From Swiss-Prot:
Pathway the protein acts in: Pyrimidine metabolism; UMP biosynthesis via salvage pathway; UMP from uracil: step 1/1
Family: Belongs to the UPRTase family.
Lineage: Bacteria, Bacillati, Mycoplasmatota, Mycoplasmoidales, Mycoplasmoidaceae
Stated name of the protein: Uracil phosphoribosyltransferase
Domain of life: Bacteria
Catalytic activity, EC: 2.4.2.9
InterPro entries membership: PRibTrfase_dom, PRTase-like, Upp_B, UPRTase/APRTase, Ura_phspho_trans
Record's cofactor remark: Binds 1 Mg(2+) ion per subunit. The magnesium is bound as Mg-PRPP.
Catalytic activity: UMP + diphosphate = 5-phospho-alpha-D-ribose 1-diphosphate + uracil
Main enzyme class: transferase
Organism for this UniProt entry: Malacoplasma penetrans (strain HF-2) (Mycoplasma penetrans)
PANTHER family on file: ADENINE PHOSPHORIBOSYLTRANSFERASE, URACIL PHOSPHORIBOSYLTRANSFERASE, CHLOROPLASTIC
Chain segments annotated as coiled-coil in the UniProt record: none
The keyword Glycosyltransferase belongs to this UniProt entry's keyword annotation: yes
Biological process according to GO: UMP salvage; uracil salvage
Amino acid sequence: MTFVFDHPLIKDKLTRMRKIQTESTKFRDNLKEITQLMAYEVTKDLELDRIEIETPITKMLGYKLKEKIVLIPILRAGLGMVDGLKELIPTASIGHIGIYRDEETAQPKEYYCKMPANLTNGNAIILDPMLATGGSASKAIEIIKTYRPKTISFICLVAAPEGLKEIEKNHPDINIYVAALDEKLNEKYYIVPGLGDAGDRIFGTK
């Protein structure tokens, strides 16, 4: 399933991120806020346990998240999305995965992977601001599937149609959440109109 957001706050904040004049601090702030806005849809089907609590007035049955949640940023740009979700889900664990493109074969290769033990039978949420060709994201999903999570969701801010089709083709069982579906990839595989190199803009390394 692919869900493309249509929300005025997301559109406003994403426009600010796209501007070439936006400095790194503001870029990170808007990335965090958009991630939090997207979290409402991403987490709406999580299961709950009933628990008894005591309010200042009386006892009652409340709710507690039942699911094990693992946030998995694709290094390095995905790191900019972690804090927003971690604030909303403080019990979430965090894994990390690094993918690079082999210059000779043009195929994505894993260079780093560290996952928490509770990923098995848990709910994996993969984070990456950009979905361009879909190669790195598809490879990350393939690796994460070996840990046998209960569900896998992929969150990105800006996607090219080519990248979206790649994931839908290779992983039709994955839920994909996109803040904006852009026009295309250019000859250098940058998303058009896009927002530039998200990693450089997050960390100020342009």
